[in-house]
Amino acid sequence: MSKNFINLYTFAGVICSTYRLPLPRLLEPLSMVLVLTIGWIIFLSSFIPVHFLLKGHDKLRKNLERCLVELICSFFVASWTGVVKYHGPRPSMRPKQVFVANHTSMIDFIILEQMTAFAVIMQKHPGWVGLLQSTILESVGCIWFNRSEAKDREIVTKKLRDHVLGVDNNPLLIFPEGTCVNNHYTVMFKKGAFELGCSVCPVAIKYNKIFVDAFWNSKKQSFTMHLLQLMTSWAVVCDVWYLEPQNIRPGESPIEFAERVRDIISTRAGLKKVPWDGYLKYSRPSPKHRERKQQSFAESMLRRLEEK
């Protein structure tokens, strides 16, 4: 089953074409900011009363907050002129399942969130993104961690296990690569999502670079500038596949399970698997590690020369 979501600007484009209005003027960055501003006004004027006035009605409050988070994410996608095609059944809320996806940009979360209010595990960010994490996204059960804090790993692991067992919790979403990759490759998946003792639901995301490259290089560009780049492009075109749930096989280790799921996602999205650790983006290898690798490479080259 596939479902097309045509956002506000796609609809506006049809109107402009019908009535011969100047489409390029409509797509100016100011218009994109206006759409997002309207979205925030609608969201905040609804979210604040719901969050503070319905504290005694937890189930109703959670359902309304979930819908409002999906709404603001839809406005974000509309501000990029996003054209997203979803393939497969909509994710359901049930215990003992976790969704895993390849990771290109923080907008992956927004694109998936407009379809279903996932609780995501995410690195803590500074600035306005961090403010959203500690306020609005807390309402859907998102879990934060800090790569530099070793003790965070144990705390996060416990939170993950508790979350997947909850009946009324939002579906849990994890990006097991641990970093943004350029949507040509998939790097090694961390095993944490694959040792929770639950079903793993793969999600494959593939961007079409016809109008803009959705890859976010956090080392070179702030997320604010990344959003502005998307908002000043013609469109963000993307396909999302919700794939068949997978379970660990008898005798299969969590690492082997992770590799099998990575293979499923890579095949569906047309991405190349590479044996790289995404965390190397955030830390330099030690001199001893480099020396061992150099020594190993030199020995392999000498063996090849001797064979010739």
Model-derived regions, located:
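Amphipathic alpha-helical interface elements that mediate macromolecular binding in regulatory proteins
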Residues: P24-S31, G39, F43-L44, E70, ...
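Short amphipathic alpha-helical interaction elements and helix-loop-helix interfaces
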Residues: L21, G39, F43, A78, ...
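Structural signal for hydrophobic/aromatic residues that build the beta-strand cores
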Residues: V33, F76, V84-Y86, Q97-L112, ...
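Short amphipathic alpha-helical molecular recognition features
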Residues: G56-L68, P91, A101-T104, L112, ...
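A cross-family acyltransferase "interaction/gating" segment
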Residues: G130-V140, N170-P171, G178, N182-R260, ...
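Catalytic core of membrane glycerolipid acyltransferases/transacylases, capturing the structured
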Residues: I42-L71, F75-W80, R90-A150, I210, ...
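N-terminal membrane-anchoring alpha-helices
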Residues: M1-W80, R292-R303, E307
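Eukaryotic intrinsically disordered and solvent-exposed regulatory patches
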Residues: V83-H87, S92-K96, T104-D108, W128-L132, ...
